[in-house]
Amino acid sequence: MKDRMNKFKEKVVLITGAGKGSGRLLAQAFAEHGSLVAANDISPINVEEVVRQIIAKGGRAKAYVEDIAKKVGVQQIINQVEDDFGRIDILINHAAVEPHVPLLDMDEWDWHRVLDVNLTGAFLMTQSVGRLMRVQGSGVIINLITESIADKNWGAAFIASMSGLEGLTHQAARELAPHGIQVYSVKNLSETVAERVFALLDLQMEER
């Protein structure tokens, strides 16, 4: 624990979908390790509650309420985080919508909204943060991916978005590596997600 505190102290960590689920767990975990947490969510109630909890425990965090499915919202987040903290060391793409709607019952709006948030949002965040990290010469981007195919309750749009996010992760890793930016995917299981993320980052830091 102490070794990790030294590794992650003062690191600026931007987490999308930080208001609930794995995003909330990771925001709290990074704050406990001394990181500066930039917590994004579309719900001001959820994300501001997370930030209050972190600050109450002596951590440092700030809420950023924007819709990451829209480019203007993404750019607002990046600009504000850069103004507040000066850089972004780690980006975690967690924001996702998860409608359990059968293919034959899903309307076009739901289809587009799922892909816009789960896939396009991750693309926009990766692109915008990646440009900042390129200037910095380093950074880590982690995409949390649900292994949706194994769960028959997920809808077609969600499964398509997770498959697309896996492909985006692989290609982003190839393109961004020359700029000192590492891109990974981590299985999104709330019980173990924090340990998986920290184990990955521990290994990544040892290899540098």
What are these regions (language model features)?
Residues 102-103, 110-115:
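Substrate-binding pocket helix/loop in short-chain dehydrogenase/reductase
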Residues 30, 87, 141, 166, ...:
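Conserved Rossmann-fold SDR core element
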Residues 126-127, 170:
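A short, exposed helix-loop element centered on a Lys and neighboring polar residues
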